[in-house]
């Protein structure tokens, strides 16, 4: 297990309860120091959390759109999984203009996103009613390819720091799968990476050395898995329904977790900086 010293893994409240709806999701750290996340005050909004933990509305999405996962495009814009409109939206970080970057009528409801260092990215796509799911590849020109069908409820998704592996969890089935990624973004060699006996899974993020942090929805914890799928830490939160996680702060070692039962975020320190934060330092 990771060393549990007094400075690590102790959750604290970032903002007051219920500033966000129960649909709070998609936290994503930006190189400008802000964290962007969905459903501030009302459904269909995106909120912004400043480095000093002030939170405000960033933008209202178009009518009929509600965001879920957010990731940062290599050019700095926000990429938002619009699960109601079956779209991937691209929002200019400077002028706030919104465009549909990708759309496919075969998408159930795009849920979470994960970028590859080469510039393409993936979307999880669950069908909650049928307890099934898909994985989509989205290229830099917005073209979409369904890579996997008939999985369980695909939810959390992440690419390893070296770009060699894709991790996808199935919330209802409580399984995390690992795939190999080729240079074109195709995936193969589906392998069971980790399985939990109870409760659900939601968003996932890697730190810079490849540890995978997984939110345990309903259990109120975040687990940390090493690159072999072994649990090396479990962090107990104050809330019970963590939906997603990102890493930020001055050194990238502050984990921010969205809590749907509290409508807010909790944070705790980790031993290694997040991979997205680390990537921004190289740009």
Each model region followed by its residue ranges:
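Glycine/small-residue-rich hydrophobic helix-like segments
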Residues: 181-244
């Amino acid at each position: 297990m990771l060393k549990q010293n007094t400075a690590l893994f102790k959750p604290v409240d970032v903002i007051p309860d219920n500033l966000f709806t129960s649909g709070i999701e998609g936290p994503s750290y930006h190189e400008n120091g802000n964290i962007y996340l969905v459903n501030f005050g009302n459904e269909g909004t995106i909120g912004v959390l400043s480095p000093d933990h002030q939170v405000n509305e960033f933008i209202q999405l178009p009518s009929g759109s509600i965001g879920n996962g957010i990731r940062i495009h290599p050019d700095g814009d926000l990429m938002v999984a619009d699960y109601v409109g079956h779209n991937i939206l691209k929002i200019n970080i400077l002028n706030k203009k919104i465009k549909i970057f990708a759309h496919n009528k075969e998408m159930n409801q795009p849920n979470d996103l994960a970028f590859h260092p080469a510039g393409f990215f993936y979307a999880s796509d669950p069908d909650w009613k049928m307890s099934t799911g898909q994985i989509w590849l989205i290229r830099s020109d917005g073209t979409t390819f369904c890579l996997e069908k008939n999985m369980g409820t695909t939810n959390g998704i992440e690419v390893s720091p070296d770009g060699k592996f894709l991790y996808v969890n199935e919330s209802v089935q409580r399984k995390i799968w690992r795939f190999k990624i080729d240079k074109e973004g195709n995936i193969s060699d589906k392998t069971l990476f980790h399985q939990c006996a109870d409760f659900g899974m939601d968003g996932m993020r890697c730190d810079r050395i490849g540890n995978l942090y997984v939110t345990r929805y309903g259990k109120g914890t975040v687990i940390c898995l090493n690159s072999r799928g072994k649990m090396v830490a479990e962090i107990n939160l104050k809330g019970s329904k963590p939906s997603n996680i990102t890493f930020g702060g001055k050194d990238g070692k502050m984990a921010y977790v969205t809590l749907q039962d509290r409508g807010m975020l909790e944070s705790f320190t980790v031993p290694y900086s997040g991979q997205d934060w680390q990537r921004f330092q190289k740009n």
